[in-house]
Amino acid sequence: MTDRVKNMLAILKKRDYRKLRSFGVRNVTEETRGLNSYDRRAKLLELAFAAEVPSLYGGDDIFGFNRTTTAVPRDDEVTDWGFGNVILDFEKLLSTGLDGIKAEAEAELTDATGEERDFLCGVIKSLAACDGIIERYRVRAEIDGRKGLAAALGQVPKRGARSYYEALLTLKFMVYALRLNRNVHTPLGRFDQYMKPYYELSKNVGATDEEIKELTELFFISLNFDTDIYLGVQTGDNGQSMVLGGMTPDGEDGANALTEICLAASEELKLIDPKINLRVNERTPISVYERGTRLTKQGLGFPQYMNDDVVIPALMAWGYDERDARNYAVAACWEFIMSGNAADIPNAASLNFPLSVERATKKLGECRDFDEFTELVKHEVKAQVDELTRQHLEHLDNPDLDPFVSAFVGDCIRNKKDVRRGGAKYNNYGMHGAGLSNAADAVTAIKVKVFDEKSVTPDELNAAIEANFEGFSELRNALIACPKTGNNDALPDGIMRELAYAFADALKGKTTPFGGVWRAGTGSAMEYVNAAAVVGATADGRKAGEYYACSFSPSLTARLSGPLSAVQSFTSFDLAPVCNGGPFTIEIHDAVFRNAEGEKKTAALVKAFIDRGGHQIQINAINRDKLLDAQAHPENYPNLIVRVWGWSGYFAELDKKYQDHVIKRAEFNFG
């Protein structure tokens, strides 16, 4: 770690820079009154930039574009936040700059009419709104004697980048601008692919890999300065995901020198951003998994691994072109999205699997056999899907427009349509599937106790559930002892498959407003807490309100025989129909990583999951005793990081309900 990196890391961790910020929200509704929707969004971006004061953190801040306001201007006519979970066309941005994209929009004006013209003018005005803050930062850099930064800002981001540093500076500006444009969850996409040409440009004029690594580390640090402002559900849920490796659009292996530089930078810095994702396949050598495990060992909760062999065919089955499918990345958490040409909403809704089982269980007495009950559960899954898709389409009937983001999403300018109005090539939606393992375990328990053993009647089971198992502890223990997903048991694993496929089938034929499809997934996001809160006790022995499993993982009440059995369970069926995203999530005791043998076993476990057809996996290196102490004494653990669902955050900054869930997850050792 160089001195420059150490200095910036110290500034980040001290957090004194936060004292430079101004607070409060300015209402600018009167200033935008009378403007059309496109011009209003452009004006709001201009006003947000105008409120910022160029600020550089110490003598080694080579990027700037740090937030000095904690809130963007408010407009009562703007009903929602900007578009999120979209990957921009970074290749075009880096090669042509803002001015090149603006010129493209100006050229399209020649034959534009009506709303097309309004849209293109909104794009042009949004891009022009960037000029002032760029120039003010350039002047500030000159005054402060930052010759390198000042010179770079004379070129980028208005024009194309000529070096690795200028490309990084363009990216930092875009992160800053997108947040001021009200966009949330703006991932960084396939960083080692679109940055490779600029790495090579710098190498060709004498830059060393150590110098490139230093720039990369300084860039990574810069992404962490304002994460307390860029909130999702919790601090850390900010969408700064980065994808490394994987197949190129031409079908070649995309891993390159930058892949390793990024992994090394993340390992050395030990920060929550950017969240690293590795694309792999059945041909990936064990050495890659061992390299990833060294990063997991740091307790960062990443890398997350994605299986090209499963994901690419699944995306093609949903209608994505092969080249585009090969170029997939991830959204803020783990949803699979396209790079630079899509307006997909991969987290549009969330199915509550145990809710469907709860509704079916109330009618259990009407079922003559288990097959009838299974069909009833599937019917309830479909009914819930029907309602969720209907509600969502009503909610998104007239979303706010976003000409700024539209400028960087392929086809929008050429089609003369906003990204929120079908301008992009792809407009698909995704639906999460929360509590899948809990639902499968509950259905399994009903089969075993009600239909096979006949040791409990439907009325007795429903009475126990209604009572939240108060006075029914013996029955609850018997339900908990029933077979569970995660133990390589064909019964619950087969039921899990049936429920997953029922979900996928229920979404077939559903369309989005712009002709897209709905994609089923195995993720839960925060619904493992929120959705669980509205469902009563369930037949797996879970009490009312108790948390579900996180995404695609064994339930919290499952007694598991070991990590390999869990891997076998969750790779026991073809995951392509439910490949919207949602990782197999597993917790391994941090003691495992104290020797080389434990690291090798962890790497082998991840490889086994991928080789068996798993779609996505993430690992937490945790220590329950340490987490309990951190919960009691947060001041002693300011830098303790955990994987929450699709993102990593500082444990001490999480709400207690999310802390509790991480603590309750199974903690594996290798025998």
Give each language-model segment a name.
Residues M1-G122, G148-K158, S163-G671:
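Conserved catalytic cores of very large enzyme subunits
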Residues D144-G145:
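A conserved hydrophobic secondary-structure block that centers on an alpha-helix together
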